[in-house]
Amino acid sequence: MATSSFPLLSFQEFLTGSEVEKRAVAQKLYNAFHTYGWVYLQDFGISKEEIAEMFAMSKKYFERPLEAKVRDTLNDAETNQGYTPDGAEANGGTDHKEKCFNLSVNVLQALAMVMDLDMNYFSSALAKADPQLRLLYYMPIERSIIESAGHARIIPHTDFGLCTLLFQDNVGGLEVDPFHTGEFVPATPIEGTCVINVADLLQRLSNDRLRSTLHRVTSPPLEKVGSDGMLPARYSTAFFVHPSADVEIDPILRDGEAKKYESVNAGKWRTMNTAKNYANILGPDGVKV
């Protein structure tokens, strides 16, 4: 275990190893997602320097005047692109976005190997995908506000796509409830790792064998809190992986297994859930959700 929350796994042998080594890594990844829904991944093909460049770009963006960022305001549930006051999404450079996409395909192919699916199963499902790279900024705020009832930097939620790749700074505050018991444990930042979690569509597709679990962002460790009681600014970069809009997500069943979910259209699912997250944009039928 990397911390009290979920495992740390090297992805190197899946990328460069033999078939036996690939399958061993794939099984460990599957086991982590089956048990916890989360994993710390290291040796995944994106350098520390490239990640640092992304954070520098994010910091530069959020240092712009508010009026400049407001011009980028998100207002369309289908495109789901733009600035929102508590976070933003931006194209951080084709190279980084493509590397994140390639990593997500490799992660999903590893799962396909264990699930006895065609190795191109997820590649096909992502053929016309529009993943989202989000640069997230959490402003400094009084610790007393965050720790009062009903408050958090991000309230407990699950992600609604296939999976999410998350790169954290060293501030901390991400917490995970892997067993939905109400007991959140820290996903402590580990340098050189990418945190990956299962999202709702992958849970549906696997008929609950892979787990999409609650997570939130709250106060970082006490040593990160200033003497004035202020929480420092926090930056993270999230890459949300969604299937192509025309893909139908229908649970893959094992022999004798009861189907737990009805089929859903990936595009409509995404638009509906995006609209739920933002009060000022429209759902798939042109009305506010």
Spans of model-derived segments:
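C-terminal flanking tails of non-heme Fe-dependent oxygenases
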Residues: 1-92, 97, 101-103, 108-289
